[in-house]
Regions:
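An acidic, Gly/Ser/Thr/Pro-rich helix-cap/linker signature
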Residues: 1-94
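Substrate-binding clefts and substrate-entry loops adjacent to catalytic sites
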Residues: 61-75, 110-117, 125-168
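Short, functionally critical alpha-helical segments immediately adjacent to catalytic or ligand/cofactor-binding
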Residues: 96-113, 170
């Protein structure tokens, strides 16, 4: 049962659909005062290597998801208990900010079998060539882009390389 929950495509497809349909310019009514959101984002920014800034579009997206996708986020929080320790171990080994783990939430809704419309696959949404470049075995029989541990190892190496190129974590 738990394995079925971990690979359910429903939350991935729903989340991708919701992301495409969010109108960042449309004000969403939700019981989250703007000043409280600004304060929380500021505290996050102070503790993070990322640049986290308030803007009205971000507020609308956050409120939209809190209002309309509460059940989906509850499922994501449950699934994260399984995957985040794997991600954190790999990221820590490579001195990568642990916040990068949330990239997998955005990319795949934590579904190791997620496949984008352009063929990116797995938790970290590696394209075929990028997966090969980071030594993931991809064939008719196996696709390590869908292996949580191997894909996380490859994602850590990829993030290291991106940091070397760009010099910051706001990739």
């Amino acid at each position: 049962l738990w394995m079925k929950e971990l690979v359910s495509l429903d939350i991935y497809n729903d989340l991708i659909g919701d992301i495409k349909n969010v109108d960042v310019d449309k004000t969403v009514e939700y019981e989250l005062p703007t000043e409280l959101l600004k304060e929380r984002l500021k505290r996050m920014d102070e503790k993070s290597p990322f640049n986290i800034e308030y803007n009205i579009g971000l507020e609308n997206v956050i409120k939209s998801f809190l209002k309309n996708r509460k059940k989906g986020f509850e499922r994501l929080m449950g699934i994260s208990q399984f995957y985040f320790p794997i991600f954190e171990e790999e990221l820590a080994k490579n001195n990568i900010p642990l916040e990068i783990k949330y990239l997998a939430v955005v990319e795949s809704a934590l579904n190791p079998l997620a496949v984008s419309r352009v063929g990116a696959t797995g938790l970290w949404q590696f394209m075929y060539q990028t997966g090969k470049q980071y030594n993931l075995n991809i064939s008719s029989y196996v696709d390590e882009r869908s292996d949580p541990l191997k894909a996380s190892q490859a994602a850590s190496k990829y993030m290291q390389n991106m940091y070397r190129i760009f010099g910051d974590w706001d990739l």
